[in-house]
């Protein structure tokens, strides 16, 4: 795992899961995509900060759980520089906490799901169309199952047989 790195940027010390838990998610995604070296910035921000970012980059004036920015290597940058850098992920822990409560999910499970979701965006996956969404969701379900986490797209009542 020495070749996989998450740069945690959490200036306000928002509560987050263990770094090992999130590194395990990166390892799963990297293994699935035959990536041996990867680096990601994980920015932990407040609801206000993510709302500003969401408004600026997505024209949506509301907080969201995650925003991913895939790295695009500038022209002229030598191939051996920044090859491993996938991009930046911005997460608002308070949004994740509220979603986990509303959806009756374990908070760490939800964190892992959303972080994997963001990593897949950095690798070019999207969910704009139904077909793209199905591919991305199926991959998320498969990766989460390897972590022992239930399908996040099934209502909690359905998972409990109610």
Curated annotation (Swiss-Prot):
Its EC number is 3.1.-.-. Pfam families: YbeY (PF02130). Keywords: Cytoplasm, Endonuclease, Hydrolase, Metal-binding, Nuclease, Ribosome biogenesis, rRNA processing, Zinc. Binds 1 zinc ion. Zn(2+) binds at residues 117, 121, 127. Its cofactor is Zn(2+). InterPro entries: MetalPrtase_cat_dom_sf_prd (IPR023091), YbeY (IPR002036), YbeY_CS (IPR020549). GO terms for molecular function: metalloendopeptidase activity; RNA endonuclease activity; zinc ion binding. GO terms for cellular component: cytoplasm. It is found in: Cytoplasm. PROSITE patterns: UPF0054 (PS01306). GO terms for biological process: rRNA processing. Belongs to the endoribonuclease YbeY family. Single strand-specific metallo-endoribonuclease involved in late-stage 70S ribosome quality control and in maturation of the 3' terminus of the 16S rRNA. HAMAP family: Endoribonucl_YbeY. This is Endoribonuclease YbeY. The lineage of its organism: Bacteria, Pseudomonadati, Pseudomonadota, Gammaproteobacteria, Thiotrichales. The gene is ybeY.
């Amino acid at each position: 795992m020495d070749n996989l790195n998450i740069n945690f940027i959490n200036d306000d010390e928002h509560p987050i899961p263990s770094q090992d838990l999130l590194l395990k998610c990166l390892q799963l995604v990297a293994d699935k995509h035959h990536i041996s070296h990867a680096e990601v910035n994980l920015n932990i921000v407040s609801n206000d900060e993510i709302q500003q970012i969401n408004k600026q980059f997505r024209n949506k004036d509301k907080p969201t759980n995650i925003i991913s920015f895939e790295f695009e290597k500038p022209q002229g940058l030598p191939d051996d520089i920044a090859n491993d850098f996938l991009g930046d992920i911005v997460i608002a822990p308070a949004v994740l906490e509220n979603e986990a409560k509303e959806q009756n999910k374990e908070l760490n499970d939800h964190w892992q799901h959303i972080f994997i979701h963001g990593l897949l965006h950095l690798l070019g996956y999207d969910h704009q169309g139904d077909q793209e969404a199905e591919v991305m969701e199926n991959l998320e379900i498969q990766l989460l199952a390897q972590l022992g986490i239930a399908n996040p797209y099934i209502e909690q009542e359905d998972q409990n047989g109610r």
